[in-house]
Amino acid sequence: MAPPSKLVVATSSVLRLVKEEASYHKELEQQEARIKKLESSTGDENAEYQMKQERQALEETKAVLPTVRAKITQALQQLEEQIESNKEAGGEASTDDVVKAKDAVAEGKKALREIS
C-alpha cells in the first residue's frame, strides 16, 4: 500500500486538532461543574484541597487552548497550501481526498470561529 499523500496527512492533522480542541472545551465544562459541586457541598474536610486541585486543573486546561488554536491555524494553512499545490500539479490526489480536505478546512475554520 502506498504511503498517504501530503494532502491526506494534512487533512487528518486538521481533523485531529479540531477534535482535540473540542475535548478541551468539554473538559473545561466538566471541571467547572465539579468546582460548582465542591462549592455547594459542605462538611468535607478535604474540600479545600480538592477545590485547589480542581481550580489548578481548570487553569491548566485554559492555558492549553491558545496553543491548540495556534496549531489549528498552522495546520489549516498547511492544508490550504496542499490543496493549492494539488490543484497546480493537475490534481494528483483523488477527488475524494480533495473533498475531505475542503471539508476539514471548513471544520477547522468553524472551530476557530467558535473559539474566538
PLM feature spans:
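Amphipathic alpha-helical coiled-coil segments
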Residues: 56-76, 112-115
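Long amphipathic alpha-helical coiled-coil segments
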Residues: 68-97
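Short, charge-rich amphipathic alpha-helices with coiled-coil/heptad character
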Residues: 1-13
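Short, Lys/Glu-rich amphipathic helical modules
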Residues: 35-54
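Non-transmembrane amphipathic alpha-helical segments
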Residues: 10, 14-17, 21-38, 61, ...
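Short, charged, amphipathic alpha-helical segments
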Residues: 48-56, 95-102
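Domain-scale macromolecular recognition modules
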Residues: 92, 97-116
